[in-house]
């Protein structure tokens, strides 16, 4: 089988040395390429889904995720994208085209790595997935993506946490097999991290949300997520459960993608509970997609959080805590590193100048 490499972006071919690797061509539904390792796909899907009903929010989410990806507004290997407006114009054309047309493999194909993670073509894949169309992929079976463009990548690039929440909710809507683990505040931070590590060892942790809440708020949250169970009809039972899972730590909600069936997830839940030593008061994991969507809406949207966060004072405290925490994170992981790089370049330039003189 011969491959026409002109169907791929030259930059991608060169970056991965694709001409040196074995490949196979396949026709697949684009939705099979929606994986949590490509968090950006869900920002693009959010844009498509909201551009006509809430254009300002759609453009804000899309533009900010592009800036996190490409701070200079340029796409490597492309001369036609010299700013966010060019990205939007190009994407609008792609959306318009695939709304009415199938993917034409005579024009292009989408490269993917051995695990089915796309190496290029995110805009095409997002549009095709939205309209439930097929795409021709060329899979390189001994190539791995050079970077994991998951939620951590975008947080570490300074994308605001509120926009990350919006994208994460979109991800939960589109990807099957996503569960939510509520790791209760009764666990100290070390044990909470142990729980996340255990989940990540077996599955792929797709997003983490930490929420600072008091006992009243946690009681409301407990009553909400367990509301289908009879015991929640008694407010004292709800309060008792909340008291047992309350502690000094944040409520940590970890969304993870599981390829295995529910029985395996339940087994993993029991193992983590045993490891943390608090039984059912260690963590809660959803059993199905509706439950996961329910929790996602409760913790990833402002309207959802306002339903259970203590309205008397916690909203302000939570916002202040979240703002300070986010700004410190951005300074430590983005601005401080950028400053060190800038200083290094200046010192290096001065050193070279001194050597020449």
Q: Which sequence ranges carry the predicted segments?
A:
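Surface-exposed, charge/polar-rich loops and edge strands
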Residues: 4-57, 75-76, 82-83, 135-172
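Short glycine-/small-residue-rich flexible loop motifs, especially phosphate/cofactor-binding loops
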Residues: 95, 125, 196-197
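Short, well-ordered, mixed-charge alpha-helical segments that flank or form enzyme active sites
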Residues: 117-120, 146, 291-294
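Non-catalytic terminal and connector segments of soluble metabolic enzymes
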Residues: 162-347
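Short alpha-helix boundary/capping and kink motifs at helix termini
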Residues: 57-119
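Catalytic metal-binding acidic patch
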Residues: 354-357
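A sequence-level detector for short glycine-anchored, His/Arg-bearing signature motifs
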Residues: 113-131
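Catalytic micro-motifs at enzyme active sites that drive phosphoryl/nucleotidyl and oxygen chemistry
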Residues: 107-109, 124-125, 241-242
């Amino acid at each position: 089988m011969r491959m026409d490499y002109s169907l791929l972006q030259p930059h991608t071919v060169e970056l991965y040395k694709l001409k040196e690797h074995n490949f196979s061509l396949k026709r697949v539904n684009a939705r099979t390429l929606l994986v949590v390792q490509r968090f950006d796909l869900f920002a693009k899907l959010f844009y498509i889904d909201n551009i006509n009903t809430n254009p300002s929010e759609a453009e804000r989410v899309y533009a900010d995720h592009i800036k996190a990806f490409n701070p200079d507004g340029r796409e490597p290997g492309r001369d036609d994208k010299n700013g966010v407006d060019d990205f939007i114009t190009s994407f609008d054309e792609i959306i318009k085209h695939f709304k009415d047309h199938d993917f034409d493999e005579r024009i292009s194909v989408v490269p993917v790595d051995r695990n089915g993670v796309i190496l290029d073509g995110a805009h095409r894949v997002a549009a095709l997935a939205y309209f439930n169309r097929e795409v021709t992929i060329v899979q390189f079976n001994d190539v791995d993506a050079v970077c994991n463009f998951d939620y951590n990548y975008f947080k570490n690039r300074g994308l605001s946490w509120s926009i990350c929440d919006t994208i994460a909710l979109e991800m939960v809507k589109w990807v099957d097999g996503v569960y939510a683990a509520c790791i209760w505040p009764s666990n100290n931070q070390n044990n909470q991290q142990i729980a996340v590590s255990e989940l990540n060892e077996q599955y792929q942790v797709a997003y983490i949300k930490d929420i600072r809440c008091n006992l009243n708020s946690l009681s409301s949250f407990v009553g909400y997520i367990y509301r289908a169970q009879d015991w929640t009809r008694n407010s004292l039972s709800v309060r008792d459960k909340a008291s047992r899972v309350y502690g000094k730590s944040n409520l940590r909600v970890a969304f993870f993608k599981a390829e295995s069936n529910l029985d395996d997830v339940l087994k993993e839940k029991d193992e983590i509970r045993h490891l943390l030593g608090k039984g059912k008061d260690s963590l809660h994991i959803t059993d199905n997609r509706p439950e996961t969507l329910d929790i996602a809406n409760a913790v990833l949207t402002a309207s959802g959080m306002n339903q259970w966060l203590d309205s008397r004072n916690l909203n302000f405290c939570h916002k202040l805590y979240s703002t300070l925490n986010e700004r410190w994170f951005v300074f430590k992981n983005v601005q401080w590193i950028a400053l060190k790089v800038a200083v290094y370049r200046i010192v290096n330039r001065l050193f070279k100048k001194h050597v020449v003189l």
